[in-house]
Each structure stands twice: as structure tokens, then as C-alpha cells.
């Protein structure tokens, strides 16, 4: 499949493009599949810099080690308040205790982000890329 470059589309292949993490969470919660691009190389070679990924809702039991997942962590912001931080990253381990699933989230270079119970979807590579230069014009 040939690499395709696009410039801030509203929709790709019939899926809505969403960049805001909370909006992605809300869409997945309603059963909607969305497109989203990430920057940086922390997911290479699963996802490339500026590549759109298709994120579809997934039940915790459907997540596998090695999947790129859309998940949530809690962090303390500049005002020292706890906030949600949503991201697409790789699941490297899964622990199940009773009904609870815990997912270990890392970069592809094995940098650990931590463990979370909050995984909402699986992200797939598309070979469609955001035109990075167009973002800066």
C-alpha cells in the first residue's frame, strides 16, 4: 500500500478524524471508530510519526499484548490538580485479578509509562499521514 499524505481532513475512509483525547474517549464509549494521528517516534514501527491510526472500541478481554491501545492515565497538572491524560501506546503486559484488568503501557523502546485499568480501544496503522508542513503554514 502506497503512503498517502493528507491535510487535516474531517473524515478518512468514512471515519471521523478526532484529535482531542476526551473526544476520542467519548466516541469510543458510544461505539464509534475514529481516526487520529500521533506525532513522535515512540510507537515506531507500529505507528509512524504523523500517521493516522484507526481506533476502534475494544472490550478489555479483547486487548492483547503488543496491541497499540487508546488509554487513560491520571497525572498532576501545573495547578497540582489530578487530570486525565489520554494516549495511544503499546500494551506490553496484562494482569487479570478477578474482574479487573490491568494493562502495562510502554513505548516501543520499552520506556514504561505505567499500569492502567483504563483502556478503551485498539489502534491500527493506516499508512495515511498528516502533512506536517501544512500544519505550520
What are these language model-derived features?
Residues 1-137:
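Extended hydrophobic leader/signal-anchor segments used for secretion and membrane insertion
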Amino acid at each position: 500500500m502506497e503512503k498517502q499524505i493528507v491535510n487535516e481532513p474531517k473524515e478518512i475512509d468514512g471515519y471521523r478524524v478526532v484529535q482531542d483525547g476526551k473526544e476520542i474517549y467519548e466516541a469510543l464509549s458510544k461505539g464509534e471508530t475514529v481516526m487520529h494521528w500521533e506525532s513522535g517516534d515512540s510507537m515506531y514501527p507500529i505507528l509512524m510519526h504523523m500517521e493516522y491510526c484507526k481506533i476502534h472500541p475494544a472490550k478489555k478481554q479483547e486487548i492483547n499484548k503488543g496491541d497499540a491501545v487508546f488509554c487513560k492515565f491520571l497525572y498532576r497538572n501545573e495547578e497540582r490538580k489530578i487530570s486525565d491524560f489520554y494516549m495511544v501506546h503499546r500494551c506490553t503486559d496484562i494482569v487479570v485479578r478477578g474482574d479487573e484488568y490491568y494493562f502495562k503501557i510502554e513505548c516501543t523502546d520499552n520506556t514504561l509509562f505505567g499500569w492502567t485499568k483504563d483502556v478503551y480501544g485498539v489502534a491500527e496503522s493506516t499508512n495515511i499521514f498528516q502533512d506536517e508542513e501544512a500544519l505550520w503554514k
